[in-house]
């Protein structure tokens, strides 16, 4: 029998993260028929609660959260820790108070197997986690999704800026 300590940590992490990424799909298949429309609300609460873990990781690893770029880099680290090395993420510095997270590969989307459009369960999960995590890490900032792979875009783009700046930008576009 092989001793688990002989398996490289990177391999164990990759395998565990792959199975963890599959869990939302399995839960959806098992519980949606029972919970019906209530399932989305319950699942959103779970992903919002998971953002507390993002805060705990940032605190425990003393990750920087003071600027938009700090937040983007911290979210990059947290998402890879929580969701595995299958995530391919970049944190781009746009200006002193703005940053963009680019997601180029998403293990959750890979588990879903296809593009689902605006009603994608992957998008709802990611949105609940990300939009809750950023202000928990620094209440002056918020996040806004600009592009998403689960709605057919080539990559996800998530803007991070001071909360009032994102609100003003959104109102101008309406």
Spans of features found by a protein language model:
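N-terminal accessory segment detector
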Residues: 1-99, 107-124, 135-136, 140-174
């Amino acid at each position: 029998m092989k001793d688990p300590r002989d398996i490289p940590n990177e391999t164990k992490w990759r395998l565990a993260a792959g199975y963890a990424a599959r869990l939302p799909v399995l839960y959806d298949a098992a519980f949606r028929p029972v919970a019906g429309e209530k399932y989305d609300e319950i699942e959103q609460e779970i992903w919002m609660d998971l953002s507390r873990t993002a805060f705990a990781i940032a605190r425990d690893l003393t990750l920087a959260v003071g600027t938009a770029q700090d937040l983007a880099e911290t979210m990059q680290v947290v998402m890879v820790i929580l969701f595995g090395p299958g995530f391919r993420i970049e944190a781009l510095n746009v200006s002193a108070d703005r940053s963009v997270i680019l997601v180029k590969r998403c293990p959750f989307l890979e588990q879903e197997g296809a593009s689902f459009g605006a009603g994608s369960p992957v998008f709802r999960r990611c949105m609940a986690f990300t939009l809750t995590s950023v202000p928990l890490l620094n209440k002056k900032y918020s996040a806004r999704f600009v592009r998403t792979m689960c709605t057919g875009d080539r990559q996800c783009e998530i803007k991070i800026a001071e909360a009032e700046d994102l609100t003003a930008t959104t109102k101008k576009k309406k």
